[in-house]
Amino acid sequence: MKQSKLLIPTLREMPSDAQVISHALMVRAGYVRQVSAGIYAYLPLANRTIEKFKTIMREEFEKIGAVEMLAPALLTADLWRESGRYETYGEDLYKLKNRDNSDFILGPTHEETFTTLVRNAVKSYKQLPLNLYQIQSKYRDEKRPRNGLLRTREFIMKDGYSFHHNYEDLDVTYEDYRQAYEAIFTRAGLDFKGIIGDGGAMGGKDSQEFMAITPARTDLDRWVVLDKSIASMDDIPKEVLEEIKAELAAWMISGEDTIAYSTESSYAANLEMATNEYKPSSKVAAEDALVEVETPHCKTIDEVAAFLSVDETQTIKTLLFVADNEPVVALLVGNDHINTVKLKNYLAADFLEPASEEEARAFFGAGFGSLGPVNLAQGSRIVADRKVQNLTNAVAGANKDGFHVTGVNPGRDFQAEYVDIREVKEGEMSPDGHGVLQFARGIEVGHIFKLGTRYSDSMGATILDENGRAVPIVMGCYGIGVSRILSAVIEQHARLFVNKTPKGDYRYAWGINFPKELAPFDVHLITVNVKDQVAQDLTAKLEADLMAKGYDVLTDDRNERVGSKFSDSDLIGLPIRVTVGKKAAEGIVEIKIKATGDSIEVNAENLIETLEILTKEH
């Protein structure tokens, strides 16, 4: 492919509105362009990478018997009313009307559509299982699109749906998808973890998320690639190294999710779902009587603890939530933080939100800062974190402004439902007892769910079982954020390329180091002087030879300065660069491996053989 024929609008500078490196490089390297807020055009390079990823997906899904189809993106609202999601999905749902004033939506997901198709076509358990998927643009009216392709209003997604006559059959397909996802993300060159996830708006029960890890850019050996002009990091002056470190740190670490994972086992979970090892403790101290004490101007746990000279771990944090229009009191040990996802899941609530100051005062008789679990109205629902039951003689709000109560003892002074509703902390023991929890940032690139009968129940999707009884179809759901993959790969494979000029100056610039499986082309073939006919002829021969051996070749045939060509090549990030330069008449070309910065000169006749050796090594 001739570069002069492609739309690759590279920029000389990083875009000023980009906060994460993947967004900046996709724009600067000419992969994408924003059409409007949260809506992007995928230019030829990005489209080629996405198509390569689609090929990987299709190959792996064929192995597990998944069949591709295509459903409409424009959906009637009636289907979503059947499932109940039209009213509950929220403001992110694009709603529109046609000329007949009928309600439609632009699909963010397609559970209802696939359920309807199968409901109308499948009548017997003998027709199951079915394993269907599509690759399609989805739509979500994001309030604040940001970070390039990571949070957009239109995005490309692979969504798959499986249909079964029982849960045992679903378990088999769910495991098939889990293994297929691992194979897909491994082939794509991603550093990822499969973690325990939350079903969220999808309505799933069991679920697993696949997160591309986005580590901090502190390891110079990982993030910096040295040109052959620099032997090692030790040769770079200290002041230049500090500049490089500052440049690495200047870009925000992307990843809207925090992952908690064990240092010694396979345990990993989204922070929203992560738990830790818990061991109940027996009370050894005698229970004191309740004593009301004045705590003037103390509104926070740390202020109360300091005023009463107690540790924060001896205090009870009392919060009020409204769950599906019903008040729920949540209790935590004072130095812990509430995990609202855990609480919402435990309550099986559709809506959960913190109560207002006015609602709290109406319920407790006091404002924030003085709330507590003692002497609440009969029938009040109290959900306490499991650690609370280990407390003896704790401090809690007295439900009276400016007062607290000491000597509070769970069981004696209040009754509660005990469950894990706290946010875990880094360094705590893993729940499996092996290793401690560490945190990392991550980008969600895939998610699989066991939907069960969530949609078949609400939409009447039934089959006749072995005994001729009508039973609901059991479903699974499997998604991959296709356009997000491009961002995730660049976040992990962006590199700062450093070289030394003949004058001894050090230069550094960002570029992409694409893994070969997803690179838009395999080889960047550059002619230094397009007016040199010998070089042109050699370039044409090498291009033909490479293509005959199965290489995708991008040939830079532009009449541009060589410095501009090399700069664009570093930005675009193809794995191999072959330069036809001043030694073309001698039949000598230069090979440069992008991942390492290594370069060698070879006879053009030996190019293919040399590339085969080098690509095996790297």
From Swiss-Prot:
Keyword annotations from UniProtKB, A to Z: Aminoacyl-tRNA synthetase, ATP-binding, Cytoplasm, Ligase, Nucleotide-binding, Protein biosynthesis
Gene3D superfamilies the record matches: Anticodon-binding domain (3.40.50.800), Bira Bifunctional Protein, Domain 2 (3.30.930.10), YbaK/aminoacyl-tRNA synthetase-associated domain (3.90.960.10)
Pfam family, one: HGTP_anticodon
Subcellular location: Cytoplasm
InterPro entries: aa-tRNA-synt_IIb (IPR002314), aa-tRNA-synth_II (IPR006195), aa-tRNA-synth_II/BPL/LPL (IPR045864), Anticodon-bd (IPR004154), Anticodon-bd_dom_sf (IPR036621), Pro-tRNA-ligase_IIa (IPR002316), Pro-tRNA-synth_IIa_bac-type (IPR004500), Pro-tRNA-Synthase_IIa_type1 (IPR023717)
Catalytic activity: tRNA(Pro) + L-proline + ATP = L-prolyl-tRNA(Pro) + AMP + diphosphate
Main location per the UniProt record: cytoplasm
Gene Ontology cellular-component annotations: cytosol
GO process annotations (BP): prolyl-tRNA aminoacylation
MF terms in GO: aminoacyl-tRNA deacylase activity; ATP binding; catalytic activity, acting on a protein; proline-tRNA ligase activity; transferase activity
Highest taxon listed in the record's lineage: Bacteria
Annotated EC: 6.1.1.15
UniProt domain comment: Consists of three domains: the N-terminal catalytic domain, the editing domain and the C-terminal anticodon-binding domain.
Its biological purpose: Catalyzes the attachment of proline to tRNA(Pro) in a two-step reaction: proline is first activated by ATP to form Pro-AMP and then transferred to the acceptor end of tRNA(Pro). As ProRS can inadvertently accommodate and process non-cognate amino acids such as alanine and cysteine, to avoid such errors it has two additional distinct editing activities against alanine. One activity is designated as 'pretransfer' editing and involves the tRNA(Pro)-independent hydrolysis of activated Ala-AMP.
Family per record: Belongs to the class-II aminoacyl-tRNA synthetase family. ProS type 1 subfamily.
Subunit description: Homodimer.
PANTHER family per the UniProt record, alphabetical: MITOCHONDRIAL RIBOSOME PROTEIN L39/PROLYL-TRNA LIGASE FAMILY MEMBER (PTHR42753), PROLINE--TRNA LIGASE (PTHR42753:SF2)
HAMAP family associated with the record: Pro_tRNA_synth_type1
Name by which UniProt lists this protein: Proline--tRNA ligase
Taxonomic source organism: Streptococcus pyogenes serotype M18 (strain MGAS8232)
